[in-house]
């Protein structure tokens, strides 16, 4: 057996073509860790009706950003960057929750490599049962069904890690520098939304998001900022205020310069490339916002990779 440690990166995934949008959405809407639609035995039927209606619209979103999600390539690049930082004792693998390579694919590859020790690193900084929880549950389910024996440890959050905060703060400072006068900029932190019921049931996601914002603004220094939530996916009550409503409120208040800071996203994908850059960008322009700029995503930025490497080193001890 190999003495290497497998570094398993857990990520949501995304369609790798327009034809993959429908199956991707079906996997998403049938995952009861992320959304419960009626009784369990009816969820696949209800999900199919929802997805059949939504898929054409979502396909158009992906068409506008190149016809697919870049999340696989970006996650694999993060894994390669981590391998370079961590050395030859580690080998990276990727497990996407709703696309390929799947958790089954990743564990099979680890087994073929003869590796017995696995560090599962969730690429969601802020813990939620809908994201990290779902990915970890899927990993445990696959392990149980396959009977595979691995020594596994989990990294399930890093919302307050000093290097993560430093990496985010660096992006905010760079974004502010793109404006003629940084003092006249509203910093808008936009996090992925979550059903309000999750928070009421004890999910720590909102607390983690708020703490990240507080720590980033501590480093950035003075500046007007607000927190909002994007990507609502059902009719139940979700976290508020929404990003759309926040942009509208800023415009009504006479704000002309918005710096959008994506939170809970460590890589570019549809929420940044389409939702913020295109959808919200067009809305902001129509409302009279003169400068609408998004901070660069972390992707494989050196500070972010250092953060992940530090998390892995700690877990490997």
UniProtKB/Swiss-Prot annotation:
Pathway: Porphyrin-containing compound metabolism; protoheme biosynthesis; protoheme from protoporphyrin-IX: step 1/1. It catalyses: heme b + 2 H(+) = protoporphyrin IX + Fe(2+). GO terms for cellular component: cytoplasm. It is found in: Cytoplasm. Signal peptide: none annotated. Its EC number is 4.98.1.1. One of its GO terms (molecular function) is ferrochelatase activity. GO terms for biological process: heme biosynthetic process. Keywords: Cytoplasm, Heme biosynthesis, Iron, Lyase, Metal-binding, Porphyrin biosynthesis. The keyword S-adenosyl-L-methionine does not apply. Fe cation binds at residues 192, 271. Belongs to the ferrochelatase family. Catalyzes the ferrous insertion into protoporphyrin IX. PANTHER family: FERROCHELATASE, FERROCHELATASE, MITOCHONDRIAL. This is Ferrochelatase.
